[in-house]
Amino acid sequence: MTRTKICGITRLNDALHASSEGVDALGFNFSRKSPRSITPSAAKKIIDELPPFVSKVGIFVEQSPAEIADICSYSKIAVAQLHSERYSAADARFLKDMVHVIRVFRPDGSFSPQSLTPFAEESGVRTFLFDAYKEGMEGGTGEEIETSVARQIFPAEGAPFFRVLAGGLNPGNVAEAIRQFRPYGVDTASGVEAKPGIKDPEKISAFLLAVRLANQP
């Protein structure tokens, strides 16, 4: 079953609705530049009300590893998503002693999936999220990964590591993306929104239903 993550949560009602519809993980964006930015205290208030079996993921772009550790501890974040090229394998290894870590890559045409292995060996990270590349932009882009690039990242079989697909996914295209690439998980933010930071409950339900149907034989 393809795992699901809805990112850019800023409101309790959105988080509770997604949880009731069976989402696997919720993302809280701590990047100060994001239109979906949330403070650690606001995230904590939401997380305190959520069911225990929904993973709480923090998205980080500007913060140092020490700041990330502090935010995760305070807000009860269980997974740190390192959404910037600035984070090294050493940074990821430092954080892995405290939380699970997802390292994000934004592959362009020159990206080699073979580069994952040395990063994994040095950092201990086993989960990688792939978002669309857009020059000069960090964090989520809301655009789809080019098909030719995605095919390299998500080979037909035998791929090591947990590989998560992000970038431009919505209720209308997520099922085809799952059938085509068979990722471990799918991640969306803008694809289920009414406007940045405000989720549309009908789109959330439709997205999660599309994922379930795509996994049926």
From Swiss-Prot:
UniProt keyword list: Amino-acid biosynthesis, Aromatic amino acid biosynthesis, Isomerase, Tryptophan biosynthesis
- Superkingdom of the organism of origin: Bacteria
Biological pathway: Amino-acid biosynthesis; L-tryptophan biosynthesis; L-tryptophan from chorismate: step 3/5
Record GO biological process: L-tryptophan biosynthetic process
The record's catalysed reaction(s) read: N-(5-phospho-beta-D-ribosyl)anthranilate = 1-(2-carboxyphenylamino)-1-deoxy-D-ribulose 5-phosphate
Taken from the UniProt record, the cysteine pairs bridged by disulfide bonds within this chain are: none
Does the record carry Transmembrane helix as a key word? Answer: no
The entry lists its GO molecular-function terms as:
phosphoribosylanthranilate isomerase activity
- Where does this protein have coiled-coil stretches? none
What EC designation does it have?
5.3.1.24
What is the enzyme's class at the highest EC level? isomerase
Concerning its family, UniProt says: Belongs to the TrpF family.
Protein's name according to its UniProt entry? N-(5'-phosphoribosyl)anthranilate isomerase
Question: Origin organism of this chain?
Answer: Chlorobium phaeovibrioides (strain DSM 265 / 1930) (Prosthecochloris vibrioformis (strain DSM 265))
